């Protein structure tokens, strides 16, 4: 990049940004269906419990898991892997972007719906402004979550108040 030619430099930077986003999208697509052994062997409940324990140990943050309605069924493997990855992404975002120190993952169900709620005590964000930023890393993260949840016919809800934390809710038909 020749810094003397500002216009060409700006074009190259924009190209590199687009290339980086394309690479990120490619990596996410490549890992889309990778299955952790815990998930294939024991199902979503055990896997989420283990995920939260491991991330808590790794990061030093308090990350707790509650199976509020004693859900114990196995789901289709595509549904389980997507719930796992969505939860993993939400926890990682809470740590990476929100500076959260306390994260709670709650799983509950009814006869027709499985719900996973991730609450954090981080700095929160303005949901409407982030959703408009399709080319930023944070905007892309929310977009990928929406795409992944739609893939399993579910819905995602983002509730956040700047300075007060975030709640992400995934509802999946069962």
Model-predicted regions and their roles:
Residues 1-174:
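Coiled-coil dimerization/phosphotransfer module
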């Amino acid at each position: 990049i020749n810094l003397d030619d500002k216009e060409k430099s700006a074009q190259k930077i924009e190209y590199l940004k687009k290339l980086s986003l394309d690479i990120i999208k490619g990596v996410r697509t490549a890992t889309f269906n990778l299955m952790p052994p815990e998930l294939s062997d024991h199902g979503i409940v055990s896997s989420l419990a283990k995920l939260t324990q491991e991330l808590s140990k790794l990061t030093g943050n308090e990350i707790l898991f509650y199976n509020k309605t004693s859900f114990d069924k196995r789901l289709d493997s595509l549904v389980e892997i997507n719930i796992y990855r969505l939860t993993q992404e939400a926890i990682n975002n809470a740590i990476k972007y929100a500076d959260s120190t306390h994260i709670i993952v709650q799983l509950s169900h009814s006869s027709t719906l499985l719900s996973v709620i991730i609450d954090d005590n981080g700095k929160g964000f303005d949901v409407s402004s982030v959703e408009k930023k399709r080319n930023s890393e944070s905007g892309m993260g929310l977009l990928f979550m929406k795409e992944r949840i739609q893939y399993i016919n579910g819905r995602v809800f983002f509730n956040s108040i700047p300075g007060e934390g975030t709640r992400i809710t995934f509802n999946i038909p069962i």
